[in-house]
Amino acid sequence: MALHTRVLRLVLSGLMGALLVVSKQAMSGLPNLEPVSLLLILFALELPRETPGAITVFILLQGVLYGFGLWWVMYLYVWYLLALLAWLLHRMDNAFFWAVFSGLYGLCFGGLCAAVYLFAKTPAFALSWWLSGLSYDALHGIGNFVLMLLLYRPLRRALQMAKKQLRV
């Protein structure tokens, strides 16, 4: 791979990570409504080589902005897992499928995050933490579903056009 292509991919990863942070910040006033899941799924589908770098930038910047607490440890696996699952299902090109997938991931988000507490605290604590946040997980799932249903097709087309222009 030419040096130019490697540099372009590195810059893309950084820009994608920054976009994740900025878009999350822009919607931070809305409870559990975030575009990160939508964007990560689309990145994994259209720019799979750059996605791990983008996730790394996003996670590190979230730690810098909000502190590297126990919540941050959750981010070390939930976002990579989402990208991996999307990449494994990359042949699907159906907005409704991805809306359901994203909605279910949002619904399961608290359960996935609670896994940290299995090791950091106790299984009872992890279960109570997860159950106490189910209403937020429901909002997260609904928000993910709606955002994906509305924005999957136009954003995927935009990414495909950008890829052609950048020749990546």
What is each of the regions a protein language model found here?
Residues 2, 6, 14, 53-56, ...:
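Juxtamembrane loop-helix boundary motifs flanking transmembrane segments in multi-pass membrane proteins
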Residues 69-76, 94-168:
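Membrane-embedded alpha-helical hairpins and interfacial helices in multi-pass inner-membrane proteins
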Residues 1, 45-48, 85-93, 153-160:
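Structural signal for the C-terminal ends of transmembrane alpha-helices
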Residues 21-34, 57-89, 117-121:
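Interfacial aromatic-anchored transmembrane helix boundaries in multi-pass membrane proteins
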